[in-house]
């Protein structure tokens, strides 16, 4: 079996090097390379914002990013023999992270966009399997790199149906980025004005943002166009169960995959969406699963008292807001800490805080804190000393897998907080 590569010039944006990829979905986008089932392919990928959020990017840039260039994907890859009705098996052999990553809160975007309306940015240094940031002293995040956007191109008929249903959603007031030639790659007018944007996940996967899709995962994606036309990008160094703030630890990466082909399986078994499997943990068990925890829950009732029927999204949102309020009261003054960071006040400049009362469940040193549906994981040391600053870890729900060296609540023993189990309807 052969190995193929798509290399990119990382000093250039996709707009400057359009022959390496695309930022729209359309079956007429020509493939960058062709391979056989069983071949390995190495793809170098750009970050989700195509270089806009580098280390020197300001909050003004975060507040008004150019979404026309999101997401720059590497590909497509044409897999010979793949046809509609098949399943393409994509085995993730490796995801090699870059040394820089970032997390941003873009105003008007994210699960709690009305709760956190201001721009925010953290710059992460990535080394030896961990991410650290000067903006969050004492914080280390264990890595579990994966591709946030990975999938196949829809066929012509599905593209037309998808565009129609998304336009209907936009007409009802939903958040949709409709087809637009502005910033599109390729800029062929026959494609750019009709091609689908990359923001939502769809039948052939795409921007699924599933943290378990790192090394060792096997993706099973229904094929809808000849050759499957596989692409990937939007790499994440670490992420929770979702992108609560709209981003994870975003980065560039090098992806290595192996393709397999299951002829006729999608048609035979009625497979219409992405499926995936793993044979081992996506993270070491002590990071991937909690033992002792503190949880908040939510119900499908708005803060104004309006009852919604079977609204799992509202219930999850309420559970997350309840967790943030719990942390604000008993552990972290997140809002004050965010204001301090935005004003340029360093942690050592802040006044000492009184030690709060213990309100969590004590666990042995080395356990971790999990926050809301974003599943932030915080390995905790055992010093038990009271914090000396205000909210070192502001906006934790916006930070994927945030970790602290000592108990952020200042309790005598480390404690740990976790999101509730997924709501089932």
Residue ranges and their predicted role:
Residues 179-310:
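Conserved mixed alpha/beta catalytic, RNA-binding, or beta-rich assembly cores of soluble enzyme
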Residues 16-26, 66-74, 196-204:
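Short, structured beta-strand/loop micro-motifs enriched in basic residues and often containing a Trp
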Residues 48-59, 95-105, 227-237, 350-353:
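Short, Lys/Arg- and Gly-enriched loop/turn segments at beta-strand edges
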Residues 94-214, 220:
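Intrinsically disordered, low-complexity linker/loop segments enriched in Gly/Pro
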Residues 43, 87-90, 221:
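A generic structural signal for residues embedded in beta-strands
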Residues 409-411, 415:
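Cysteine-centered motifs
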Residues 2-65:
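N-terminal, Lys/Arg-enriched amphipathic/low-complexity engagement segments
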